[in-house]
């Protein structure tokens, strides 16, 4: 167990290295921080921290830099979450409030996170495996052509055009709309197939072909939309950190192109807590020089998806964690109000 003084020395090393991008020496630490001890004592503390794997010497005659283990201790014990200022919170809310639909919410969230943290932002669309149907709208476009509009509880809207096998009157369409919503509104996607399986029997024989076509389109839409989707932005920010990656940023960029990798990085959508994965804690080798900060978002207490950022391990953890948490909270509020 490290002493309080050595924890303070580690905190100072992390803060200085993140701020200056330069290895940190004992003389600089005593000049910049009120540690209350001599440079010689700080050197001894740094030697102990190095022996225990919390800091390392990148070059001979250079200062020290934090290791993955050092960053982990900093995040777990030393770094609080930096709160956003009042003006920052208002700017976030005003920017997100301008969104017109779910795609716009996700797009604005990605841009906002990338701008606030100057990292790569990743936002997962709400997981429809946990979504419920808010409403199904059916609109007549022609005697034998119908538009189906599926609206979910998370604000997601999907539209499908349906060519009916026979003309379908307004009265029949209104009847189908009412019967359909009475069965599926407020129900989870997984329950819908069983709820509508005998619905066509309530209609006249000449209309059953069209009803079956509409129901098949609805079920196909539900299956298609349960696929996980995400949006990524701010990859250009990585070019500012070229020297933070041991060889090249290419493995990082390749990893960011793999949706499966990103979904695993963000973790389970049902876990709403803040997660910080540092360096080699990331299972994907191409991301061993990065850190991932993610958190769940959603309406109410249940998280429906994750959002987060990817950047070098030399990251402003308190500021990044604060920005990610604040943005997630506002996105959740928008979903709840939509």
UniProtKB/Swiss-Prot annotation:
Keywords: Repressor, Stress response, Transcription, Transcription regulation
Residue stretches spanning the membrane: none
One Gene Ontology biological process: negative regulation of DNA-templated transcription
One Pfam family this sequence matches: HrcA
Gene Ontology MF, one: DNA binding
Function statement: Negative regulator of class I heat shock genes (grpE-dnaK-dnaJ and groELS operons). Prevents heat-shock induction of these operons.
Protein family: Belongs to the HrcA family.
Protein name: Heat-inducible transcription repressor HrcA
